[in-house]
Amino acid sequence: MIRSRARAVCTSWCPALALAVLAGCGEFKWDRPPKPPPEAAPPQRAAVATDALVAGSIAAQTYLADVEPLALRGFGLVVGLGDKGSSDCPSVVREYLAEYLTKQIAPQGGGRRPKLSPEELIDSLDTAVVEVVGYVPAGAPAGMRIDLQLSAIVGSSTQTLEGGLLLPTELRLFDRAATGRGMIQGNVLARAGGPVFVSPFAAADPRKGYVLGGGRINEARPLRLILVQPNYQLAQQMERRINERFGPKPRVAEAVSRGFLTLKTPPAYAAEPDHFRRLVVRLYLDNQPGFVERKVQELTRAATAGEVRLEPVAYAWEALGRNVLPRLQPLYAASDAGVRFYAARAGARLNDSAALAVLAEIAAARGDPHRLLAVRELGASNSPQATLPLVPLLSDADQEIRIAAYLALQEHNHPAIRSLPFRCVLDRAQLNCVLDLVECDGPPLVYVRRTRAPRIAVFGRQVPVHAPVFYRHPDESVTLVSAAETADVKLFARWGRKLSDEILVPPRVSELVSALADVPEPDAAGRLRGLGLPYSRVVQVLAQLCEDGTIPARLVVEQTSLTDILGPEDTPERPETDRDPPPGADAAPQPPEEPARDEPLLPARPKQDAARGTR
């Protein structure tokens, strides 16, 4: 059958390719010339600022360069498309892929050879050549994962990328002006691969998709700190101050010339390179106790008088270090909500447990304008006590607060969330999706991620699937049926011309998702474990069942924004919308614009039953 042929192709190619690519990681460097690059002409600006916030800081005499996201591009092969792929491929890309795939397999030697040669694989209708684009944020550390955008080659006859698997792919600097072999030349800066997510909603282009967290950066991407007035002694002074604050090993700052320093994100900030970028420029060159005392007083007066924006002040407090805590702690009780939050934020980042208690109060206070930020700040803390106040917020009346608390707790692997991973049918080493069961009170909620990792979170206690159930996908690839309220839900799939065995599951959302997403293999009793549907198809089924009331829950899809690529602004927001298209919905290969914050569009609707009336 079609699915069987796709599985055979992947079985023969994927494991060997994965081993070869892993063995080759770390052999490549970022594109950089052998000598320091020419120093950019400084912009027309004052060399030294005089206001209380900036005067004496690194920001007063420098500016950061290389802060835009860096676009990477590569060409790869998606397998597992049945007969919906194509053999269309530009000759230059075809030659490159054939050579690359051959080299990756050759070192294995002595093992099982693939059933198809690279050329035959490219020509198969089970595969499609795609352009792969990813964005590396400023200051990204080595090993950081990035989302990928995939597009079928323009002009090809590929019908869809849904259900496919991107074979290991090389990513290089994206030169939009490059043509011919120039498109595939340059150092390999990242590796890519994984299951493809195609938006299941009607407006999406099935020839475009995402691989969530599918790119891995080979080496850290440094920043450059440019001196407005080049001076090597000053550059060295800044180097010493930065390394003193963030630790000399591994080396964070290096004065390359009189005109600039290079900065690498320290390990403590690996998950938040934007945090480091905003903090480092707020360092003051003078670190003597007398200066610190005077500076704290200046900053506090300016903040409480409303003379400055509070976000930069909070970074300045944090940059001064733990010596500021005695002056900062009285502000935890400030009458001004903004001063209170930002003082507590700075204190929490300086490991003050009293500040965490204040953030917990803000997070729990309905109506506080900094509530969502407090939840995220608690989630970013490494302190074990920071997660405790987040658990009750899973049941909060505010949907955004519930989701933010879940995201924070999930990052900490908190026991309040039980995670069930499901492997990819085409390659068991890859992840199809993760089901997070969030045991909490409050209205049932289904939350779907569209960045970083394919995750579905189900909020509630034993969220039911109401009968009668009848769902059939438009292409008849999956069918769900249940007649009685207490009856099990019957599922089966169509693989080519063959029907799968039936699966019976209790009428609960957790059981239903497991049956849809798990691999189609027998369990210990010989029964089929799952249908092996791709993440996008699982989301599509859930969306329809939530919309018609079969599942009494809202379906909320994470909405990506410019923040996901560039990092948060001074007051970050991650809007969430109901039934907003997941990744790949007509997304151009470039950073999206910051979306407006939307109200929920899809509340849980009562299911209509002609015989019994409204549920």
Residue map of PLM features:
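Bacterial N-terminal signal peptides that target proteins for export
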Residues: 2-14
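C-terminal motif of bacterial Sec signal peptides marking the signal peptidase cleavage site
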Residues: 21-24
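Beta-strand/loop-dominated core regions that host nucleotide or nucleotide-derived cofactor-binding catalytic loops
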Residues: 26-73, 79-298, 304-309, 320, ...
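Ordered, small/hydrophobic-rich secondary-structure cores
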Residues: 224-244, 248, 337, 344-347, ...
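Active-site proximal loops enriched in glycine and acidic residues that flank catalytic Cys/His/Asp
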Residues: 265, 332, 345, 363, ...
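Short inter-helical turns and helix N-cap capping residues of alpha-solenoid HEAT/ARM repeat scaffolds
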Residues: 306, 335-336, 366-367, 397-398
